Curated annotation (Swiss-Prot):
Disulphide bond pairs: none
Protein name: Ribosomal RNA small subunit methyltransferase G
The enzyme's E.C. designation: 2.1.1.170
Subcellular location: Cytoplasm
Catalytic activity: guanosine(527) in 16S rRNA + S-adenosyl-L-methionine = N(7)-methylguanosine(527) in 16S rRNA + S-adenosyl-L-homocysteine
Top class in the EC scheme: transferase
Origin species: Shewanella oneidensis (strain ATCC 700550 / JCM 31522 / CIP 106686 / LMG 19005 / NCIMB 14063 / MR-1)
Amino acid sequence: MLSAQLEAYLAEINLPATAEQKKQLLDFVGMLNKWNKAYNLTSVRDPEIMLVRHIMDSLVVSKHLQGDRFIDVGTGPGLPGIPLAIMNPDKTFVLLDSLGKRIRFQKQVAFELGIHNVSSIESRVEAYQPEQKFDGVLSRAFASIHDMLTWCHHLPAEHGQFYALKGQLSDDEMQHIPTGFAITETIELKVPRLDEQRHLLKIIKE
């Protein structure tokens, strides 16, 4: 059942996937559902809803990524980083979260599913000082745009950008962007079977 749904959703967003990638995505849902019972990683309890709200909600960003090296801040159980890493094996993803149980889950997922282009780091974002900066800084359900930019300003490389995954856009939030940053693009995203607004904001340091 889940397999057929995934197939249909990927076709709907026009995202080609190999048999191995589809298996990894479904296995990720299975592990998230299993671990969630003990670790409370997400409020979503139904695997079919996980597929929409977590997997597809992450993957609609995939074709908009520019660059090779990304960091997912406040990643939680690895969203959107793990689904994006599965679908973009040529790119590398660092998953950053301050909670150890989430990091342990991410590492187990990467090990069991054979995902070799992710690494997980337990740290608060403002305390994390990478040796190499990033082409893209991803945030989903992490913080307000203002706080995200304030805390993550040191993470992008010279020509890197921020990718803020948001629901409904708030005029107040959009108007309170810190000095020195600019929104370059606002993209309306359509997530299969999700009747809610989704947007991707691309932001650069000026």
